């Protein structure tokens, strides 16, 4: 079968909410994106797609909440828009994954802290890179679904 032939398979569509790969010096998200793509999942790495696209994604994966809203965001309206976008994608069947890299950034303002709260509580599953993070998160959010993937 060549690339032009249609199949009955519906590929999973995933979005990693992170700036476009060519615009980063952080290799975590690009490597993750490439590894996921190798499994046959249709994945893209884009912050703009989260805010502007109407694409129906199956999975939306958050990395750093401050990456989603802006690293030094001081616009209180971004919180309303974040909640709207999550509702929009969820209404189209999206499931949310959050990789918890940090408990909170060292210098988070109220808007960044609120973005963390929203993403933490709205994610269907939270990925942790260590047991301390998973235990801490489960204590804060007893109903959460958590998985540890050591790195």
Task: Describe every region a protein language model picked out.
Residues 80-95, 104-126:
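Membrane-proximal helix-turn-helix segments that form the acceptor-binding/catalytic region
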Residues 2-63, 67-69:
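N-terminal pre-catalytic "stem/leader" segment of glycosyltransferase-like enzymes
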Residues 14-20, 78, 85-94, 141-148:
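P-loop/Walker A phosphate-binding loop and immediately adjacent motor/lid segment at beta-alpha junctions
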Residues 121-138, 142-151:
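Donor nucleotide-sugar binding/catalytic pocket of nucleotide-sugar-dependent glycosyltransferases
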Residues 67-80:
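Short, flexible/disordered intra-domain loops and linkers
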Residues 60, 96-98:
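Hydrophobic faces of well-ordered beta-strands that scaffold small-molecule active sites
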Residues 36-43, 74-76, 102-108:
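Short, flexible loop segments at the rims of nucleotide/cofactor-binding pockets, characterized by
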